[in-house]
Amino acid sequence: MQTFSTWKVVCLTTFLLFGGIWALALVLPSGDNSKLQALAHAPIALFIGVGVAVYVLEGLVWTVGAIELGARLARSPRLGAAVGVGGYGLLSHWSGGSSSVIAATWIALVLNCSYLTLRQRCKRIAILSTVGHKLAYFLMAAYVVYTYGA
C-alpha cells in the first residue's frame, strides 16, 4: 500500500475541500440568499467570534469525536467517520435544503477521510489539520458573506 506524506494529504484535502465546494456551487441551485444578507449586516467581531467557535466545535464533534468514539466503542474508526458524515451532513444541515445537505456531506466526507489517513501517523496532526481546514473554510465563507452579501 502506497503511503503519502503528511503534506501531500493536507494539500490534497485542501484541494478537494475547496475545489469540491467550488464545483458544487456551479452545479447546485443557489440557496436562500436572505440568510446571507442578514449575516452581512452582523457586526464582524460577533460574526467571527461565534463562527470560529461553531466551526471548531463542528470539527471536533463530527470528525474527531465521531471517529475516536467509533474507534473506542465499536473498534471501527471508519464506522465513526460514517456516523460523523451522516451527522454533520444530514442532522446538522437538513433544514437548509438539498444543496446544504450535499455541500455539508462533501465537507464532512473530505475532512473525515483526511482525518482517518492522518490519524494513522499522528492524532495531533490529524486534529490540527481538521480544525485548520474548518477555520480556513470559515474564513472563506466570511469573505463571501461580507463581500457579496451586502
Where are these predicted regions, by residue range?
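Transmembrane helix-loop-helix hairpins at the membrane interface
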Residues: 47-150
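Juxtamembrane helix-loop-helix connectors linking adjacent transmembrane helices
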Residues: 1-74, 82-83
